[in-house]
Protein backbone atom coordinates (compact mmCIF):
# COMPACT_ATOMS: atom_id res chain seq x y z
CA UNK A 1 0.00 0.00 0.00
CA UNK A 2 1.06 3.68 -0.07
CA UNK A 3 3.78 2.84 -2.60
CA UNK A 4 6.07 1.38 0.10
CA UNK A 5 8.30 -1.47 -0.95
CA UNK A 6 8.96 -4.12 1.65
CA UNK A 7 12.27 -5.81 1.10
CA UNK A 8 13.11 -8.95 3.01
CA UNK A 9 16.72 -8.73 4.08
CA UNK A 10 18.97 -11.75 3.73
CA UNK A 11 20.70 -11.32 7.09
CA UNK A 12 19.67 -10.16 10.54
CA UNK A 13 23.07 -8.59 11.18
CA UNK A 14 25.90 -7.14 9.16
CA UNK A 15 29.18 -7.12 11.09
CA UNK A 16 31.95 -4.87 9.78
CA UNK A 17 35.38 -6.19 10.76
CA UNK A 18 36.41 -9.71 11.75
CA UNK A 19 38.61 -8.89 14.74
CA UNK A 20 37.78 -10.28 18.19
CA UNK A 21 34.85 -7.92 18.80
CA UNK A 22 33.16 -8.54 15.45
CA UNK A 23 33.86 -12.28 15.44
CA UNK A 24 32.49 -12.83 18.95
CA UNK A 25 29.39 -10.75 18.25
CA UNK A 26 28.78 -12.78 15.07
CA UNK A 27 29.29 -16.05 16.97
CA UNK A 28 26.85 -15.09 19.73
CA UNK A 29 24.26 -13.81 17.22
CA UNK A 30 24.42 -17.10 15.29
CA UNK A 31 24.11 -19.03 18.55
CA UNK A 32 20.94 -17.02 19.27
CA UNK A 33 19.49 -18.16 15.94
CA UNK A 34 20.25 -15.01 13.93
CA UNK A 35 21.76 -14.90 10.44
CA UNK A 36 24.97 -12.91 10.14
CA UNK A 37 27.20 -11.62 7.36
CA UNK A 38 30.74 -10.50 8.29
CA UNK A 39 32.71 -8.25 5.95
CA UNK A 40 36.34 -7.18 6.24
CA UNK A 41 38.33 -4.89 3.97
CA UNK A 42 41.51 -6.86 4.63
CA UNK A 43 42.32 -10.08 2.74
CA UNK A 44 42.27 -12.00 6.04
CA UNK A 45 40.16 -12.46 9.14
CA UNK A 46 41.18 -11.67 12.76
CA UNK A 47 41.86 -7.92 12.45
CA UNK A 48 44.93 -6.74 14.34
CA UNK A 49 45.46 -10.09 16.06
CA UNK A 50 45.98 -11.80 12.68
CA UNK A 51 48.82 -14.34 12.74
CA UNK A 52 50.39 -16.20 9.85
CA UNK A 53 52.76 -19.17 9.70
CA UNK A 54 56.31 -18.41 8.56
CA UNK A 55 58.90 -21.21 8.79
CA UNK A 56 56.62 -22.96 11.28
CA UNK A 57 56.35 -19.86 13.49
CA UNK A 58 53.10 -17.97 14.11
CA UNK A 59 54.06 -14.40 13.27
CA UNK A 60 51.92 -11.60 14.77
CA UNK A 61 51.60 -9.31 11.74
CA UNK A 62 50.37 -6.27 13.68
CA UNK A 63 52.53 -6.38 16.80
CA UNK A 64 52.66 -8.97 19.57
CA UNK A 65 49.38 -9.81 21.29
CA UNK A 66 49.37 -11.61 24.62
CA UNK A 67 45.95 -12.55 25.93
CA UNK A 68 45.58 -11.75 29.63
CA UNK A 69 42.62 -11.42 31.99
CA UNK A 70 41.68 -11.83 35.64
CA UNK A 71 38.12 -12.74 34.69
CA UNK A 72 37.50 -16.50 34.96
CA UNK A 73 34.36 -16.31 32.80
CA UNK A 74 36.28 -14.56 30.01
CA UNK A 75 39.06 -17.16 30.20
CA UNK A 76 36.60 -20.08 30.13
CA UNK A 77 34.81 -18.48 27.18
CA UNK A 78 37.88 -17.85 25.00
CA UNK A 79 39.42 -21.26 25.71
CA UNK A 80 36.42 -22.90 24.00
CA UNK A 81 37.96 -21.79 20.73
CA UNK A 82 41.64 -22.54 21.28
CA UNK A 83 44.03 -24.19 23.64
CA UNK A 84 46.40 -21.60 25.09
CA UNK A 85 50.07 -22.06 25.89
CA UNK A 86 51.51 -20.87 29.18
CA UNK A 87 53.40 -17.90 27.76
CA UNK A 88 54.17 -15.32 30.43
CA UNK A 89 55.45 -11.97 29.23
CA UNK A 90 58.77 -11.33 30.99
CA UNK A 91 60.61 -8.70 28.93
CA UNK A 92 64.35 -8.18 29.20
CA UNK A 93 66.17 -4.96 28.29
CA UNK A 94 69.67 -5.14 26.79
CA UNK A 95 71.84 -2.19 27.85
CA UNK A 96 75.34 -2.48 26.33
CA UNK A 97 75.35 -6.26 26.80
CA UNK A 98 73.87 -6.13 30.32
CA UNK A 99 70.43 -7.77 30.59
CA UNK A 100 67.86 -6.18 32.88
CA UNK A 101 64.49 -7.57 33.87
CA UNK A 102 61.41 -5.48 33.03
CA UNK A 103 59.22 -3.99 34.44
CA UNK A 104 61.55 -2.66 37.15
CA UNK A 105 61.61 -5.22 39.97
CA UNK A 106 64.02 -6.75 42.47
CA UNK A 107 65.82 -8.73 39.74
CA UNK A 108 66.48 -5.38 38.00
CA UNK A 109 67.73 -3.70 41.17
CA UNK A 110 69.87 -6.66 42.15
CA UNK A 111 71.59 -6.56 38.75
CA UNK A 112 71.92 -2.77 38.88
CA UNK A 113 73.24 -2.32 42.45
CA UNK A 114 73.70 -5.77 44.02
CA UNK A 115 70.90 -5.11 46.53
CA UNK A 116 68.97 -8.13 47.79
CA UNK A 117 66.15 -6.73 49.94
CA UNK A 118 63.24 -4.43 49.04
CA UNK A 119 64.39 -2.01 51.78
CA UNK A 120 67.85 -1.66 50.20
CA UNK A 121 66.35 -1.11 46.74
CA UNK A 122 63.84 1.47 48.00
CA UNK A 123 66.60 3.33 49.87
CA UNK A 124 68.81 3.43 46.74
CA UNK A 125 65.97 4.78 44.59
CA UNK A 126 64.98 7.38 47.21
CA UNK A 127 68.59 8.54 47.54
CA UNK A 128 68.91 9.03 43.76
CA UNK A 129 65.51 10.72 43.40
CA UNK A 130 66.72 13.53 45.68
CA UNK A 131 68.90 14.82 42.83
CA UNK A 132 65.81 16.61 41.49
CA UNK A 133 64.48 19.37 43.71
CA UNK A 134 61.39 21.34 42.79
CA UNK A 135 59.12 20.75 39.81
CA UNK A 136 60.73 18.66 37.01
CA UNK A 137 61.29 20.88 33.95
CA UNK A 138 61.59 18.13 31.34
CA UNK A 139 61.24 14.39 30.84
CA UNK A 140 64.76 13.65 32.06
CA UNK A 141 64.16 15.39 35.38
CA UNK A 142 60.73 13.79 35.70
CA UNK A 143 62.13 10.27 35.19
CA UNK A 144 64.99 10.85 37.66
CA UNK A 145 62.48 12.19 40.22
CA UNK A 146 60.53 8.92 39.86
CA UNK A 147 63.23 6.22 39.68
CA UNK A 148 66.65 7.86 40.11
CA UNK A 149 69.52 8.47 37.68
CA UNK A 150 70.90 4.92 37.26
CA UNK A 151 67.61 3.42 36.09
CA UNK A 152 66.91 6.49 33.97
CA UNK A 153 70.31 6.40 32.21
CA UNK A 154 70.28 2.67 31.51
CA UNK A 155 66.62 1.77 31.02
CA UNK A 156 64.59 4.90 30.20
CA UNK A 157 66.74 7.42 28.33
CA UNK A 158 67.78 5.50 25.19
CA UNK A 159 64.40 3.86 24.61
CA UNK A 160 62.49 7.13 25.10
CA UNK A 161 64.79 9.15 22.84
CA UNK A 162 64.50 6.52 20.11
CA UNK A 163 60.70 6.52 20.52
CA UNK A 164 60.32 10.31 20.30
CA UNK A 165 63.30 11.12 18.08
CA UNK A 166 64.67 13.79 20.41
CA UNK A 167 66.69 14.37 23.56
CA UNK A 168 64.89 13.71 26.87
CA UNK A 169 65.85 17.23 28.02
CA UNK A 170 63.76 18.60 25.13
CA UNK A 171 60.70 16.50 25.95
CA UNK A 172 57.99 17.73 28.36
CA UNK A 173 57.80 16.17 31.82
CA UNK A 174 54.10 15.20 31.47
CA UNK A 175 54.89 12.44 28.93
CA UNK A 176 55.88 10.18 31.84
CA UNK A 177 53.28 10.26 34.61
CA UNK A 178 54.67 7.30 36.52
CA UNK A 179 57.18 4.48 36.16
CA UNK A 180 56.00 1.28 37.86
CA UNK A 181 58.47 -0.06 40.42
CA UNK A 182 57.97 -3.47 42.01
CA UNK A 183 59.85 -4.23 45.17
CA UNK A 184 59.33 -7.98 44.65
CA UNK A 185 61.14 -10.69 42.69
CA UNK A 186 58.45 -10.74 40.00
CA UNK A 187 59.23 -10.21 36.33
CA UNK A 188 55.74 -11.06 35.08
CA UNK A 189 54.76 -8.06 32.93
CA UNK A 190 51.03 -8.55 33.52
CA UNK A 191 49.51 -9.15 36.93
CA UNK A 192 46.67 -11.09 35.30
CA UNK A 193 45.74 -14.50 36.66
CA UNK A 194 45.18 -15.99 33.19
CA UNK A 195 47.50 -15.34 30.28
CA UNK A 196 48.90 -16.97 27.19
CA UNK A 197 48.85 -17.16 23.40
CA UNK A 198 46.57 -19.56 21.50
CA UNK A 199 48.34 -22.66 20.20
CA UNK A 200 48.13 -22.59 16.43
CA UNK A 201 47.86 -18.79 16.41
CA UNK A 202 45.09 -16.23 16.73
CA UNK A 203 43.89 -16.65 13.14
CA UNK A 204 43.00 -20.30 13.82
CA UNK A 205 41.17 -19.24 16.98
CA UNK A 206 39.12 -16.61 15.11
CA UNK A 207 38.38 -19.20 12.38
CA UNK A 208 36.85 -21.37 15.11
CA UNK A 209 34.83 -18.43 16.47
CA UNK A 210 33.50 -17.71 12.96
CA UNK A 211 32.73 -21.35 12.17
CA UNK A 212 29.61 -21.62 10.02
CA UNK A 213 29.33 -17.83 9.49
CA UNK A 214 29.56 -16.21 6.07
CA UNK A 215 32.60 -13.94 5.76
CA UNK A 216 33.44 -11.72 2.80
CA UNK A 217 37.05 -10.56 2.70
CA UNK A 218 38.54 -7.73 0.58
CA UNK A 219 35.20 -5.97 1.08
CA UNK A 220 35.34 -2.36 2.25
CA UNK A 221 32.01 -1.50 3.86
CA UNK A 222 32.29 2.19 2.96
CA UNK A 223 32.81 1.35 -0.71
CA UNK A 224 29.82 -1.04 -0.80
CA UNK A 225 27.61 0.63 1.81
CA UNK A 226 24.39 0.76 -0.20
CA UNK A 227 24.61 -2.80 -1.44
CA UNK A 228 25.54 -4.18 2.02
CA UNK A 229 22.92 -2.13 3.88
CA UNK A 230 20.30 -3.68 1.60
CA UNK A 231 21.36 -7.15 2.75
CA UNK A 232 21.12 -6.75 6.52
Predicted segments, located by residue:
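Conserved beta-strand segments of alpha/beta enzyme cores
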Residues: 35, 58, 83, 214-216
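A short alpha-helix-loop-beta-strand transition element characteristic
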Residues: 74-96, 151-154
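Short, Lys/Arg-enriched N-terminal segments with co-localized hydrophobic residues
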Residues: 1-9
